[in-house]
Amino acid sequence: MYLIPTVIEQTNRGERAYDIYSRLLKDRIIFLGSPIDDQVANSIVSQLLFLAAEDPEKDISLYINSPGGSITAGLAIYDTMQFIKPDVSTICIGMAASMGAFLLAAGAKGKRFALPNSEVMIHQPLGGAQGQATEIEIAAKRILFLRDKLNRILAENTGQPIEVIERDTDRDNFMTAQKAQEYGIIDRVLTRLEDK
């Protein structure tokens, strides 16, 4: 278990204590720093919707340090990023792997970044099935459908041909921040916040 830091803010009406994530949200910063499951996706989606309703013209920054996770949960975040009016800028800190890399590439064009020592990893969806042969067949068809959908979206977001995406996601494919820029997952490597 880890401790969530609290920030004390002085105002003319006194002191106010925020958990760090609530304080960042005031500056339109969302932090994805865990594996992606339904609970995490619901939190990210609700923050995106809140910020979009609060000011539909102002960018939102999504900082990503995630090993990936559930495809359906990740697609809920992805669809919301595309659905809302504000641009969502994505910034990789540490690692953006699997669905984390998918979301990194889904940021607004020209506003996708990574810090110099961060790492990006893309691969095909993982899954397993057990049970009767027909259940295994259904699961296999679904994972192939999801793989094709994710590859198509990743090709659109990176500018890579679908054949290149299919080849490069066949196994775990790790990239430095610089390589992720060359590949089209990000637009620029940031060394200072002002560079953004």
Curated annotation (Swiss-Prot):
Q: Name one GO cellular component term.
A: endopeptidase Clp complex
CDD domains noted in UniProt: S14_ClpP_2
Which is one GO molecular function term here?
A: ATPase binding
The UniProt entry's GO biological process terms, in alphabetical order, are: protein quality control for misfolded or incompletely synthesized proteins
Q: What class of enzyme is it?
A: hydrolase
Where is this chain's protein located in or outside the cell?
A: Cytoplasm
Its catalytic activity?
Hydrolysis of proteins to small peptides in the presence of ATP and magnesium. alpha-casein is the usual test substrate. In the absence of ATP, only oligopeptides shorter than five residues are hydrolyzed (such as succinyl-Leu-Tyr-|-NHMec, and Leu-Tyr-Leu-|-Tyr-Trp, in which cleavage of the -Tyr-|-Leu- and -Tyr-|-Trp bonds also occurs)
Q: Specify the domain of life of the species encoding this protein.
A: Bacteria
Q: What is its EC number?
A: 3.4.21.92
Q: Which InterPro entries match?
A: ClpP (IPR001907), ClpP/crotonase-like_dom_sf (IPR029045), ClpP/TepA (IPR023562), ClpP_His_AS (IPR033135), ClpP_Ser_AS (IPR018215)
Q: Which SUPFAM superfamilies has this protein been placed in?
A: ClpP/crotonase (SSF52096)
Where is it mainly found? cytoplasm
Disulfide bonds, which pairs?
A: none
What positions constitute the catalytic site?
A: 98, 123
Which keywords does the record carry?
Answer: Cytoplasm, Hydrolase, Protease, Serine protease
Q: How does it assemble?
A: Fourteen ClpP subunits assemble into 2 heptameric rings which stack back to back to give a disk-like structure with a central cavity, resembling the structure of eukaryotic proteasomes.
Q: Please give the family membership noted in the entry.
A: Belongs to the peptidase S14 family.
The record's section on PANTHER family has: ATP-DEPENDENT CLP PROTEASE PROTEOLYTIC SUBUNIT (PTHR10381:SF70)
Per the entry, what this protein does is: Cleaves peptides in various proteins in a process that requires ATP hydrolysis. Has a chymotrypsin-like activity. Plays a major role in the degradation of misfolded proteins.
| Name by which UniProt lists this protein | ATP-dependent Clp protease proteolytic subunit
What species is this protein from? Geobacillus thermodenitrificans (strain NG80-2)
Give the encoding gene's name. Answer: clpP
